[in-house]
Amino acid sequence: MNKKQLNFEKSLKKLEEIVSEIENADPDLDKALALFAEGAELIKSCLAKLNETKKKIEVIISSGKTEFFKE
């Protein structure tokens, strides 16, 4: 599965599935390591997306283009 094709929500869902499989399926060491590596890549991807989104929000707020409360 190509992690770059997954959006943030699908990546989180996949991470939940990986954690569940490691906790409940009792995989052998090689399978557990592969799942761990896949999860680490998904985490990296999610963090990058969160940081990118945070920067966009900061730009919007600092530009004054957004009013949070209109009276």
Swiss-Prot record:
It catalyses: Exonucleolytic cleavage in either 5'- to 3'- or 3'- to 5'-direction to yield nucleoside 5'-phosphates. It comes from the Bacteria. Keywords: Cytoplasm, Exonuclease, Hydrolase, Nuclease. InterPro entries: Exonuc_VII_S (IPR003761), Exonuc_VII_ssu_sf (IPR037004). One of its GO terms (biological process) is DNA catabolic process. The keyword Cytoplasm applies. Heterooligomer composed of large and small subunits. Belongs to the XseB family. This is Exodeoxyribonuclease 7 small subunit. The gene is xseB.
